[in-house]
C-alpha cells in the first residue's frame, strides 16, 4: 500500500462555529458519529469507541488528541486495541462566508495493512466518506 492518506473534503451550509461544535461537543458528536464517553477537546485527552463493518466484527479504536486549534483544527492518534499500526486523523475547518469547508485527513493507514481487508484503504475511504458526506452533512443541514 502506498503511503497516501485518505482525504475527504466537503462544504457545508453551516457556519464554522456550528461545524466545530459538531466535532467537539460530546452531546453533538453522538448524534452523527459515535458515542464517546465524556469527550473533551483537550490535548492529551484519550477516548475510545467500537466500530467496524455493518456485517462484520467491531474493533476497539484507541485515540488521543494531539492538537487543538480552537474553531479550526482537531487532530488525534488512531489505533486499534490488539492490532499493529498507528495513524493520525485531522479535521480542519475553513470559513467560506456563511459556509464551512471541512478537510478530513487520515494518514498512516498503511501501518494497518497486515491486519486484514477490514483495514484496507478502501474501507477507510468508504467510512470517512459516509461520515463527512452523509452523517455530518445531514446533521448540520437538518432544517436548513
Regions found by a protein language model. Give the residues of each.
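Hydrophobic ligand-binding cavity/cleft-lining segments
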Residues: 1-38
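Aromatic-glycine hotspot motif
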Residues: 1-12, 16, 94-105, 144
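Residue-level preference for beta-strand/loop junctions
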Residues: 3-4, 43, 57, 85
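A short gly/proline-enriched turn/hairpin at secondary-structure junctions
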Residues: 6, 30-37, 49-55, 77-79
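Generic structural detector for well-ordered beta-strands
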Residues: 7-13, 40, 48, 64, ...
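Hydrophobic pocket/interface hotspot
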Residues: 19-20, 29, 47-49, 65, ...
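Hydrophobic-ligand binding "helix-grip"
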Residues: 38, 55-101, 107-110
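A conserved amphipathic terminal alpha-helix motif
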Residues: 101, 108-144
Amino acid at each position: 500500500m502506498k503511503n497516501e492518506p485518505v482525504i475527504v473534503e466537503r462544504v457545508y451550509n453551516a457556519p464554522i462555529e456550528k461545524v466545530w461544535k459538531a466535532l467537539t461537543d460530546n452531546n453533538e458528536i453522538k448524534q452523527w458519529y459515535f458515542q464517546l464517553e465524556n469527550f473533551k477537546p483537550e490535548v492529551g485527552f484519550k477516548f475510545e469507541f467500537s466500530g467496524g463493518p455493518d456485517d462484520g466484527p467491531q474493533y476497539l479504536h484507541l485515540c488521543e488528541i494531539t492538537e487543538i486549534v480552537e474553531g479550526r483544527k482537531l487532530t488525534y492518534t488512531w489505533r486499534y486495541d490488539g492490532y499493529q499500526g498507528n495513524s493520525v486523523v485531522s479535521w480542519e475547518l475553513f470559513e467560506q462566508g456563511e459556509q464551512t469547508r471541512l478537510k478530513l485527513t487520515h494518514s498512516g493507514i498503511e501501518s494497518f495493512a497486515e491486519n486484514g481487508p477490514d483495514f484496507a484503504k478502501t474501507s477507510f475511504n468508504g467510512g470517512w466518506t459516509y461520515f463527512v458526506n452523509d452523517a455530518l452533512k445531514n446533521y448540520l443541514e437538518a432544517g436548513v
